[in-house]
């Protein structure tokens, strides 16, 4: 089990939010939308948003 700081460092290295990341999320959303039910998209969107939000909240 990693300590909180080790976890943060791992997250920082593996995921740096920036404009291209946001753009990728939008592209993924656009690709997924036609292929899934609305509830599936909403669930996925909430999961991504809450995960990204948590990363910022931890700093």
From Swiss-Prot:
Consequence of gene loss (knockout): No visible phenotype, but increased leaf starch content and decreased protein content. Increased accumulation of SAQR.
GO biological process, one term: negative regulation of starch metabolic process
Protein location: Cytoplasm
Superkingdom per UniProt: Eukaryota
Tissue: Expressed in hypocotyls, leaves, vasculature, hydathodes, trichomes, pedicels, sepals, filaments, mature pollen, stigma papillae, styles, siliques, root and shoot tips, but not in shoot meristem, petals or root epidermis.
GO cellular-component term (any): cytosol
Induction note: Down-regulated by cold. Up-regulated by treatment with 5-aza-2'-deoxycytidine. Up-regulated during the dark phase of the diurnal cycle. Regulated by the transcription factor WRKY46 and up-regulated by light.
UniProt keywords, alphabetically: Cytoplasm, Starch biosynthesis
Its job: Involved in regulating carbon and nitrogen allocation to starch and protein.
Miscellaneous comment in the UniProt entry for this protein: The expression of QQS varies considerably among natural accessions as well as within populations directly sampled from the wild. This variation correlates negatively with the DNA methylation level of repeated sequences located within the 5'end of the gene.
Protein name stated in the entry: Protein QUA-QUINE STARCH
Taxonomic lineage: Eukaryota, Viridiplantae, Streptophyta, Embryophyta, Tracheophyta
